[in-house]
Amino acid sequence: MKHQEYILQKAVCRFLEKEYPNVLFLSDTIGNIKLTESQAYRNKQIQKNGFKCPDLLILEPNRLWNGLFIELKIKSPYKKNGQLYKNEHLQAQEKSINDLIKKGYFAFFKWDFEDIKKLIHAYMKDK
C-alpha cells in the first residue's frame, strides 16, 4: 500500500518540477520509510503532537490561499455517501487538513493523479 502511495507522490513531485520549476515544495518522506525504534522516538520528539502533516506542501501563495497542502492517498478516504471512513489515522489527518484550512492554506485529500494535476494547475492560475 505504502509503495503505491510513494509512486503517486513521486509522480506528483516530477510533475511539479516540470510544470512549475520555480515553485518551492516539500514532500514528506517519513511515511514511506521504516525507522528504527530510536529514529522513530527521535522523530516523534520533534513533531507537533496530534498534527498529521500532509504528504505534499506546495509553498506558493495565490490570491486566496497561503499555500497548497495535499494528503495523498491511493484510493478515496471517503465512503460513497461522502463521509470519511471510520479510521483513527484518517480522522487525525482530516482534523489537520481542517486546521490548515482555518489558517489560510488550501488543503485536501487527493488520490487520482489526473485530478491532482488539474487542481494544481487551477491553484497556480489563481494568482
Regions found by a protein language model. Name each.
Residues 1-127:
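Catalytic phosphate/metal-binding cores of nucleic-acid and nucleotide-processing enzymes, i.e., regions
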